[in-house]
Amino acid sequence: MKKFLSLLVCLMLTLGLIGCASGSDDKSADTDKKESSDEATNDELKGHLVIYTSEPQDLVTEMLEDFVSKNPGVTYELYRSGTGDVKTKLSTELDAGGTDANVLWFADLGYMYDLDDQGLIYHYSPESAKDLPDTYKYNDGMGHEVRAIYSVLAYNTTQIDKAPKDWDDVTTDDYKGSLAIANPAYSGGAMTTLSVHVEPDNESTVGWDWYQKLADNDVKMEQSNGTLLTKVASGEYKGAVIVDYLPRNSKNEGSPIDYVYPESGSVLIPTPLCLMDNMS
């Protein structure tokens, strides 16, 4: 149990847990990751990990491959899909008697709390999490935030001359038939955005009226944020409601895309990393 726990904690560090820590920088993060990897190698960690995630396939695979290259006694299986699909798979397995998943990393904090209420989440707080703001730590070790991502407004810079400033700006004729959102049934980010937007007394609330305005303006729906990024960058859509790191990375790579954090408030998308309580 302790040996496998140390393996999982090292994986949590590799996946960037310390990246949310206040006052941390790239240099210190790299140092801490190196130290954790060295410890893992020195301890000759061995085991098989099963990870369920909604994070981008290439991102997670790169992290995992880096981890196992430093720990050759470790193997892994990765299931990656949209949050909705991941939850369906996990729930089906649990209903059938159990799951092999050890690590959960997807965008549905409420679902993680439900699992925790059933006694299915292993509570543990690694030393590296001590400097994390409380905002990024959940239920006394139930889970920790790996990174902070937000739902924002992205637009194609060759088609939009004046950047939107707030949510209502994309309900105008400029975006008629050319604004898209992700499917909340598939995308955890889209579901979180919808939930926050219609929650009473929330500072980021825009209400159902905003979604009705989108519908009246012939809003489009795609399955995932990744598809939104591709179609905004190509010019098929003028804009999209999307998670911020995708247009940021695309912009940095030279794509004709930019993004804004709405003035009335962007939506934080919790994507906690949790450990299933099935270690042996």
What are these regions (language model features)?
Residues 89-96:
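Short, well-structured alpha-helical segments in soluble
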Residues 41-46, 50-75, 85, 250-251:
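Short, polar/charged alpha-helical segment
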Residues 18-35:
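Bacterial lipoprotein signal-peptidase II cleavage site
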Residues 149, 211-214, 221, 253-277:
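Periplasmic-binding protein-like
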Residues 110-114, 233, 238-256:
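A ligand-binding cleft/hinge motif common to bilobed small-molecule-binding domains
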Residues 53-61, 83-84, 99-236:
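Extracytoplasmic ligand-binding site segments that recognize negatively charged/polar headgroups
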Residues 2-23:
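Sec-dependent N-terminal signal peptides of Gram-positive bacterial secreted proteins and lipoproteins
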